[in-house]
């Protein structure tokens, strides 16, 4: 685990725990433990395309300074075993939260993200979400538009829960 904390004026304003490069085998039919488990029930209500053009990784690097060959170009990504360049995980998270409209309301809330499989570039994954009675937002980024009943976070490229 990688733990981080940011303080301002002696007050903690951000805290995170990142579990990186974690792989495990599960028994047949068992859910992987790294997938956020939403408490909310109900139908997945939104299905929105999230265009990820071929230059997404380069644009993200220009803004953040996070230059990584797997995000820059298909040629450099192949050197690391990827068939194409892949979107940065924080790009997929940030873009999903912006489309859901929760990017401005995150302070004081909990965000759990599981990066299940890479978002290859270019592609247009689909964002599905549902909101529980308690205001918890569950979302998944899927490689193709699933039927509402098929929006299972275990099948998502990226799965997340915003709560609190």
Give names to the regions the model predicted:
Residues 1-49, 118-121, 126-164:
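HotDog/MaoC-like acyl-thioester-processing domains
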Residues 18-87, 101:
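Catalytic strand-loop segment that frames the active site of acyl-thioester-processing enzymes
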Residues 1, 81-82, 91-131, 136:
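Hydrophobic beta-strand-centered segment that forms part of the acyl-chain substrate-binding groove
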Residues 4, 16, 57, 61-64, ...:
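Small-side-chain structural scaffolding
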């Amino acid at each position: 685990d990688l733990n981080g904390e940011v303080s301002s004026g002696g007050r903690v304003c951000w805290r995170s725990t990142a579990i990186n490069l974690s792989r495990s085998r599960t028994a047949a039919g068992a859910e992987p433990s790294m997938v956020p488990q939403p408490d909310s029930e109900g139908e997945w209500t939104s299905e929105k395309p999230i265009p990820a053009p071929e230059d997404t990784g380069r644009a993200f690097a220009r803004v953040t300074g996070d230059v990584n060959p797997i995000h820059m170009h298909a040629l450099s990504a192949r050197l690391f075993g990827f068939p194409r360049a892949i979107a940065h995980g924080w790009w997929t998270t940030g873009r999903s939260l912006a489309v859901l409209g929760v990017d401005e309301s995150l302070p004081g809330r909990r965000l759990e993200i599981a990066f299940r499989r890479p978002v290859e570039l270019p592609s247009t994954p689909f964002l599905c979400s549902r909101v529980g009675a308690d205001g918890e937002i569950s979302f998944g980024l899927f490689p193709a538009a699933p039927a509402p009943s098929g929006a299972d976070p275990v099948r998502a490229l990226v799965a997340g829960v915003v709560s609190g």
